[in-house]
Amino acid sequence: MKIIGWNINGIRGKSMNLFNKDKTINNECEFSRMLELYNPEVVCFGETKCQEIHVENFEQLPFKYKSWNCSRARKGYSGVCILSNIEFTDLGSIPINDGDIEGRSRVVEFEECVLIYVYTPNSGGRGEYRIEWDTVMYNYLEELKEKNKMIILGGDMNVVNMEQDIHSRKVLYESKLPGTLLHERLNFRKYFDIGYIDIW
């Protein structure tokens, strides 16, 4: 199964240029070129920034199965989706206490694996929410192991795990920027303690 994840920063934006004026798929846009080049069975989008009322505009995207999670907290914010040509069972969102009102996760189950795609909240000004998110995600990943299937977690984790994940080693060790904080990195590394590995 070939899976591609893409943080698109707005699926409706002109920069995506998905559709022609007659609403057909633009075969010259980056999305179409990516499909032609890689031919993925599954595409995951992060930061779609669209609302539920816009989802029907994307029905003609060349994937048979689609799962969207749009922000209900505010317009033009967050959002993720999973598009697939392989049938899946939609498991909804991670069990965050607010019901994932910001549209930050989608979970689907294929015959051979479970795929989780996330847009993890940035901790800047929201440290407590980020800690809650990390705790819920850890517990959910632990729980999913009971399915005895491969578990794939993808998306924007908003954390710098290793030096190779950032442009400057100095930023990683001397910064107080969100994503570089020690507790965020340690929380992320807890996933490895329960059998997950970091790939990129």
Where are these regions (language model features)?
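Metal-dependent phosphoesterases centered on the DNase I-like endonuclease/exonuclease/phosphatase
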Residues: 136-200
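Structured beta-strand-rich core segments of catalytic domains in phosphoester-bond hydrolases
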Residues: 48-123
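Surface-exposed cleft-lining segments at the edges of enzyme active sites
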Residues: 96, 119-134, 138, 172-176
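Soluble or luminal CAZymes and related metallo-dependent hydrolases
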Residues: 17-18, 23-30, 100, 129-137, ...
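Short catalytic/ligand-binding loop motif for oxyanion handling, primarily in non-cytosolic enzymes
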Residues: 12-14, 51-54, 75-76, 123-126, ...
